[in-house]
Design a protein with these regions (language model features):
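Conserved pre-ATP/AMP-binding loop-to-beta segment of ANL
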Residues: 81-98
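Conserved AMP-binding loop of ANL adenylate-forming enzymes
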Residues: 131-177
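Short, solvent-exposed loop/turn and secondary-structure capping segments
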Residues: 110-111, 159, 226
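Conserved structural elements of the adenylate-forming
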Residues: 112-134
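Conserved adenylation A10 loop of the ANL superfamily
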Residues: 96-110, 461
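Active-site glycine/GP-rich loop and adjacent strand/helix microenvironment
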Residues: 1-53, 61-68, 76-83, 168-504
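Accessory carbohydrate-recognition regions in carbohydrate-active enzymes
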Residues: 37, 56-57, 69, 114-121
Length: 504
């Protein structure tokens, strides 16, 4: 560890000790978060509506405040964007994280209060570096620059003083100036709206810089890496940036991309660290490089609740606090935060791998799964299966999506996968057969429905021509940033749209 990194790393040690206490004090820490959130918001319009002052504990909170979706809170958020204060949260909120919308809206605008910005998102970034340095005492992290690949922001159409953009852009815009000393590219470049021009500008401004860390979404960072290699004529990223040591990634599963990164960055010193930083808050980070699970961050002014996946959408689902969850079960996450979200259903599903400390994997989205035949196929099943089959066959998958395909009588059907390959497998039939068998190994419900083909026929694969998924994102105005391909869908909307592009 160089002198600068060693000196700065001393500042992280007190926080490392606090995180270690998560294993013993999780329940008390969580209830402290709830008490503080209720106290802070007791005089807001929302707090007065539900009489926060009289809430004595979790039982009262759970009984009094209904579960919320974006459609439920949208009228309040709109008023906040228009300059009203003391609505969902006491402070005036000038920044909003823009994310993919609901059935009724093209986009969601989620409040980014000063409190959640500092006490959740930036705290998560601080802790990520802290844990990374703790796990890698030979790091030279602060001796070189970090490249952050973010989105863009633009003034909200609702109010001149309210700004919106994808989360990464909001975070970059409000970043401590000291952090900018160790970050590239220039803020003006990273916040460019037009994706393809941005990639060119990033490459031109950074390829001669000493970069040792990357931060971003795996799929989009891969585009940038290939652009850097094309610019320099290099085979490996370490030829361009020899001090490269870590990629902080999130937004989508890293599994389908892991082998491609290892091929382009063939270094024993290269590390990969996953974070869970959503528009609604920073929720988890990978604290053990030997495990793919994430540590739930329980002291970020976020109170967590969980709905068993089979009860999502019910009028009165079971809702559990953190102390009541079980290992191995899929839950939809519900959050209460210093961003003014109260019992808010974010749409992500998680599965706990350990308790005390609470570790989990992101298993998917409440809307991104296939359960047309009772198979309950989740995104993490699909990602793992694709990754395993690629290793077995030597194939490389660039993007994929899957949806049910019903037979004429609708009593039977199959899953149709559309896959864009970076490298085709020797035999597509063998790839499909292996994928089908691997899904059965990973998911007992899928295996049961495939038994003797009673309700589910063998899956089929349609090969997408090069650029199909990129073009779909371009037409949707979703190039770059935190935009992602829907991996699984219970209907055929996405796959039909992709099919039309593929046929054109």
């Amino acid at each position: 560890m160089d002198i600068l990194t060693n000196t700065i790393s001393l500042l992280f040690r007190p926080r490392q000790k606090e995180i270690a206490r998560f294993a013993q004090d999780a329940d008390a820490i969580q209830h402290k978060q709830l008490k503080s959130l209720l106290s802070t918001a007791r005089n807001t319009e929302w707090g007065l509506k539900y009489d926060y002052k009289s809430i004595q504990g979790y039982a009262d909170f759970c009984e009094r405040i209904p579960l919320q979706t974006y459609d439920d809170i949208k009228p309040y958020v709109t008023r906040m964007i228009n300059g009203e204060r003391n609505i969902l949260w006491p402070s005036v909120v000038r920044w909003y994280a823009k994310s993919s919308g609901t059935t009724n809206d093209k986009s969601k605008f989620l409040p980014v209060t000063p409190e959640i910005l500092k006490g959740c998102h930036y705290k998560g970034g601080f802790d990520t570096v802290s844990i990374y340095l703790q796990n890698n005492p030979d790091s030279h992290f602060f001796a070189s620059k970090g490249l952050i690949l973010g989105g863009s922001h633009s003034p909200s159409p609702l109010n001149r003083n309210a700004h919106c953009g994808d989360l990464s852009a909001v975070l970059l815009q409000n970043l401590n100036p000291l952090v900018n000393l160790i970050r590239v590219p220039d803020k003006k470049i990273i916040l460019m709206d037009e994706w393809e021009s941005k990639i060119k500008a990033i490459v031109e401004s950074t390829w001669k810089t000493d970069v040792n860390s990357l931060s971003g979404v795996p799929s989009w960072m891969l585009v940038l890496i290939k652009a850097v290699l094309q610019k320099t004529g290099s085979e490996y990223l370490t030829d361009v940036w020899p001090n490269m040591e870590v990629f902080f990634h999130g937004g989508i599963s890293f599994e389908p991309y892991r082998d491609q990164y290892k091929a382009l960055i063939p270094s024993d010193r290269m590390h990969y660290m996953e974070t869970y930083n959503a528009s609604e808050g920073f929720f988890g980070l990978q604290n053990n490089p030997e495990e793919h699970s994430l540590l739930l961050m329980i002291d970020y002014s976020v109170f967590y609740e969980f709905i068993p996946i089979n009860e999502v959408g019910e009028e009165h689902p079971t809702v559990l606090p953190l102390e009541a969850v079980e290992v191995g079960k899929n839950y939809a996450m519900v959050i209460t935060t210093s961003g003014g979200l109260w019992r808010y259903q974010i749409g992500d599903t998680v599965r706990f791998t350990s308790l005390y400390p609470h570790k989990f994997v992101i298993s998917g989205r409440t809307k991104n799964f296939i359960n047309a035949f009772g198979e309950e196929l989740m995104v993490d099943n699909a990602d793992k299966a694709i990754s395993r089959v690629c290793r077995q066959t030597g194939a490389k998958v660039k993007e994929y999506t899957a949806a049910p395909l019903f037979m004429l009588d609708k009593a039977k059907g199959r899953h149709q996968w559309m896959i864009e390959f970076e490298k085709m497998p020797p035999s597509l039939d063998d790839f499909a057969s292996l994928l089908d068998k691997t899904l059965q190994q990973l998911n007992s419900d899928y295996e049961a429905k495939r038994y003797k083909e009673i309700s589910l026929q063998p899956l089929e694969i349609r090969v997408a021509r090069e650029g199909t998924f990129y073009e779909w994102l371009r037409r949707k105005g979703k190039l770059g940033g935190q935009h992602k391909i829907p991996r699984l869908s219970n209907d055929r909307t996405f796959i039909e749209e992709l099919g039309k592009i593929c046929d054109s």
